[in-house]
């Protein structure tokens, strides 16, 4: 059985490390956590934690790609639903473009990718605050646009 106090300590240490914005790989995070006394931590656990807390890779002040928890994003909660992170949705004849809060694009893209072709999504490309969504062959960009709007309950 998990020790809740130890789990809380791990989460605090994990978040503190990401705030340092100096870890460019999951392996580096594993080593840092092991140095802090979490011997049973491994890359798989770090990967799950990065996903759970919405961590993204971005450039730090030294222009190095590092993992971080964007301040604007934090961890989505019931008081900050994902739809509040979507600022604008637009389309042309080929793709749908979604603008999000800074740092939220990869999280929203992951959600859209999980819906897949049955919802009309062939794939996504996400930056920091912009997502390109390509429709599956059986959907037009307009149909996909309308589906995404309804998903995030936006006005047409």
Swiss-Prot record:
It holds the Pfam family Arg_repressor. Disulfide bonds: none annotated. Its main location: cytoplasm. One of its GO terms (cellular component) is cytoplasm. GO terms for biological process: L-arginine biosynthetic process; protein complex oligomerization; regulation of arginine biosynthetic process. The keyword DNA-binding applies. GO terms for molecular function: arginine binding; DNA binding; DNA-binding transcription factor activity. Keywords: Amino-acid biosynthesis, Arginine biosynthesis, Cytoplasm, DNA-binding, Repressor, Transcription, Transcription regulation. HAMAP family: Arg_repressor. Belongs to the ArgR family. PANTHER family: ARGININE REPRESSOR (PTHR34471:SF1). This is Arginine repressor. It comes from Serratia proteamaculans (strain 568). The gene is argR.
């Amino acid at each position: 059985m998990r020790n809740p106090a130890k789990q809380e300590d791990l989460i605090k240490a994990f978040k503190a490390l990401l705030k340092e914005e100096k870890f460019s790989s999951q392996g580096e995070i594993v080593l840092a956590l092991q140095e802090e006394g979490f011997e049973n931590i491994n890359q798989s656990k770090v990967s799950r934690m990065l996903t759970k807390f919405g961590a993204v890779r971005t450039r730090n002040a030294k222009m190095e790609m590092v993992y971080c928890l964007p301040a604007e994003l934090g961890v989505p909660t019931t008081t900050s639903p994902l739809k509040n992170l979507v600022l604008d949705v637009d389309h042309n004849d080929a793709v749908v473009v979604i603008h999000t809060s800074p740092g939220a694009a990869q999280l929203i893209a992951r959600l859209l990718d999980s819906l897949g072709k049955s919802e009309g999504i062939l794939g996504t490309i996400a930056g920091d605050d912009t997502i390109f969504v390509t429709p599956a062959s059986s959907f037009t960009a307009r149909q996909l646009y309308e589906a995404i709007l309804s998903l995030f309950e936006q006005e047409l």
